[in-house]
A protein has these predicted regions:
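Core segments of small alpha/beta cavity-forming domains
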Residues: 1-60
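Surface-exposed loop/turn and secondary-structure junction residues enriched for glycine/proline
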Residues: 6, 10, 54, 65-68, ...
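Short, surface-exposed linear patches
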Residues: 49-50, 85-92, 103-107
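Surface-exposed, charged secondary-structure patches
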Residues: 56-95
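Short beta-strand edge/turn micro-motifs at domain boundaries
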Residues: 80, 94-122
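General N-terminal targeting signals
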Residues: 29, 49, 86, 98-100, ...
């Protein structure tokens, strides 16, 4: 557990923050095709169930978002990166603080990073 030498943490975190905003937009609009591009199969199923339970659309603006790479763990099959996001959202007109850890997974044999889990901290 740690960050491998030579890993482009700044580039990784810039992409993670951009994907945070994209995923929030896809969640708000209920865009399953977009969600499926950035999530693991298990996470996609979870989000699909939550979208059905939510019903309707939401309107979220990411006001501020900071990201911190907590570490990367590698197994025989995949790399797992944990990123802590702290920020401020405007959800349906109401300001909310957000603090959560996203676990991103990437196959060892190639492929992109996908959202595999979310842990709320607040």
């Amino acid at each position: 557990w740690g960050i491998p030498a030579g890993f482009d943490s700044a580039g990784f975190l810039a992409a993670a923050k951009a994907n945070y905003v994209k995923l929030q937009q896809a969640w708000d609009s209920g865009d399953l095709a977009e969600l499926s591009e950035f999530t693991s199969n298990d996470m996609f199923i979870t989000l699909t169930h939550e979208l059905r339970a939510r019903g309707g659309k939401s309107n979220t603006e990411v006001v501020t978002i900071d990201a911190d790479l907590l570490g990367i763990e590698s197994t025989a099959d995949e790399h797992i990166a944990s990123v802590k996001f702290d920020g401020t959202l405007k959800v349906d007109g109401e300001i909310e603080r957000v603090s959560e850890v996203w676990n991103l997974a990437k196959p060892v044999r190639g492929g992109g990073w996908v959202l595999a889990g979310i842990q709320q901290l607040d």
